[in-house]
Amino acid sequence: MTEYRNFLLLFITSLSVIYPCTGISWLGLTINGSSVGWNQTHHCKLLDGLVPDQQQLCKRNLELMHSIVRAARLTKSACTSSFSDMRWNWSSIESAPHFTPDLAKGTREAAFVVSLAAAVVSHAIARACASGDLPSCSCAAMPSEQAAPDFRWGGCGDNLRYYGLQMGSAFSDAPMRNRRSGPQDFRLMQLHNNAVGRQVLMDSLEMKCKCHGVSGSCSVKTCWKGLQDISTISADLKSKYLSATKVIPRQIGTRRQLVPREMEVRPVGENELVYLVSSPDYCTQNAKQGSLGTTDRQCNKTASGSESCGLMCCGRGYNAYTEVLVERCQCKYHWCCYVSCKTCKRTVERYVSK
Amino acid sequence: MGSLSRQAFFQELGSGCLLPTVQQGLEQVWQLLLICLVCRLSWRLGLPNFLKHLSTVVGGFYTLYLFFELHMVWVVLLSLLCYLILFLCRHSSSRGPFLSITILIYLLLGELHMMDTTTWHKMRGSQMVVAMKAVSLAFDLDKGIVDKVPSPVEFMGYIYFVGTVIFGPWISFNSYMDAVESRKLSVSWFMKSVISCVKSQLCLLISNCVAPYLFPYFIPVFGNKLLRKWLQAYENSLSFHFSNYFVSFLGETTTTLAGAGFTEEKDNLKWDMTIAKPLYVEFPRSMVEVVTSWNLPMSRWLNTYVFRKALRYGSFTAIIMTYTASALLHGLSFHIGAVLLTLGFITYIEHVLRKRLSAILNACVLSKRCPSDCKHRHKKELWVYLINGTFSMLALLHLTYLGSDFRPQDGVASHTIQKWTQLSWTSHWLTFALWVFYRLIL
């Protein structure tokens, strides 16, 4: 059995090398996607990031592309801020549409980026829809399922459910429905993680409700869409990343499914990120594993978590240097309506890994 | 990638919060307003009083059903129980106390046994108004202010008066009977209704869409960790305040629209019902002023039927009993009980301290504003303003502290304790310090 697994793993690795992952290749749109006007169908073929199905989607929905380019940009910045305290160097995401092995293989890091990208693209489309930038969508109809008997529907807040998720799903899932994108197990993993990302997005956009009544009773309840940041979604997915489950493929009946590698008695949860390949420790530079190492990475001497110098530097120690910061201070608000600040200089000590 | 930019925030706020809030605010109350108006118009038709009472009972039942559906039976049961007690004790002179105890038992049983918290919580406002009406009627009968037990249809008309049955406020039985006389339709009546309605929607918007995002979007104050806790507490507090004003102005609207809520002096009719005074709460002189300005009819009720009757046991006891009664009317919520009891101590200590300072300094520094002809020597000196200003700031801090955790649906005790711990029990400590100071200057 162990030999079979080893063989299978080797086989998957070989296939991954032969067919580079294109599930999130569209993140490469940030490179030159913003310089294109997206008003002619031939623009869809100019860029590297799109697979054939996505090109078709692009041609039929040119107006979506601005949102998708924006989503690619947002995904990269959210990824950057989420992982600044981790050893894994997120800069490899900048090489999209061609990825180094840390993202090209079915690693935990790839699971995070894939799910985040799926969430952000749906979010961006939904917001464009809500703001009226997309002529092809309109205010959502009254949902058939009522949240509660006294729940009243309020406005266009729910464009996410019907248009953002649908179009976002069509776009981000498209590469994985193509057999040439990689082995089936890899595609199943990506599709699962895409779904997790969208679910996190859905959960974060719950309605906020408030009660009004005599002395705080609940005679009248008003509900509205809560304002959400991408950083909220990103933080949620990061915690799922930290508790992600390693899976192996298994034939169950006529279908191939992913099941947890360790405890083989339970199915994979719908809210769990999954990965196929274990990650290196990212301490030293190793091109084969896509590890850039932590040398010269900034760390926090006083912290105790993953950003601490002890963990970030993998025990190699760190160097200290000073930096002069120029920042705004003594800000005052002037009625109405602007803020004026003075400029101050502050010297801080920084630490980087050896 | 931080929070939304300011411009993006305001765009999001408009479509995501302002619009849905107004839409839902009107959607849920337009039928109530319509029924109030129909009731008012029908009373102008010259119907016999019997039919007038009956029409408002029908309107009241319908609005109760609109808001609470079948759960309205609990309100109906309470009113039937009240009438039964009044009828059975019609020859007694202690109807007030007896009815009060009966209602208390009913409310406690309801709270503890009869149904799930969410449903009971929804109706609590209406139950409270019914209880207050019945108790006031009983005491007024004892004192002869109302000369005989009203007929069933009169009683039910009073209890289910469509103008006050959902959002209050409490009005006396005599006020209701005055309303049944049905004053002429007039521009000032209509304008009062419209203006109160507009005010209520404005307060709803502030409660939902402005207060929760006050810092740093509306007012660019960022602050350090400690200050941010207080800023957030202030936001929660403000949101709760404006929710109360929304309900108060809505109550003004429905009451006026239904034909009550006026004062009459020598043929001069004024549609001047006032339930809450927002400016006196948001820019308070003292906590005493805050407490009375929060809900004027309720203040009047508590003063008339609880405080004055308890005064024979001493002013401190009377104050505590008043706040206890208020807490019980609000239901068995640890949070509300804790807030009201704390409020009771705060107001009492502030009151006696300022009274003492006023005597020692011979200055206008009482909890309530001095009339212009008071005999204090010092009225407009700078240090008088400073003392009053200090107490105002204290009141603002108390309000922020007490209102920092109003999520009425979860009555978990530990949450209140936790929130007050986060704010270092500041108001409690300050109140204690003021009490020590008061004892020192006795």
From Swiss-Prot, chain A:
Entry annotated with the keyword Glycoprotein: yes
Signal peptide: 1-23
Glycosylation (residues): N32, N39, N89, N300
Record key words, sorted: Developmental protein, Disulfide bond, Extracellular matrix, Glycoprotein, Lipoprotein, Secreted, Signal, Wnt signaling pathway
O-palmitoleoyl serine-type lipidated residues: S215
Matches recorded under Pfam families: wnt (PF00110)
Gene Ontology biological-process annotations: camera-type eye development; canonical Wnt signaling pathway; cell fate commitment; cell migration; cell migration involved in gastrulation; cell-cell adhesion; central nervous system development; convergent extension
UniProt similarity note: Belongs to the Wnt family.
GO CC list: cytoplasm; extracellular space; plasma membrane
Molecular-function GO terms, alphabetical: cytokine activity; frizzled binding; protein heterodimerization activity
Protein name: Protein Wnt-11
Function recorded in the entry: Ligand for fzd5, a member of the G-protein coupled frizzled receptor family. Plays a role in early eye development, possibly through wnt non-canonical signaling. Promotes eye formation, at least partially, by antagonizing the Wnt/beta-catenin pathway. In addition, promotes coherence of eye field cells, potentially contributing to the coordinated morphogenetic behaviors of cells in the nascent eye field.
InterPro entries in the record: Wnt (IPR005817), Wnt_C (IPR043158), Wnt_CS (IPR018161)
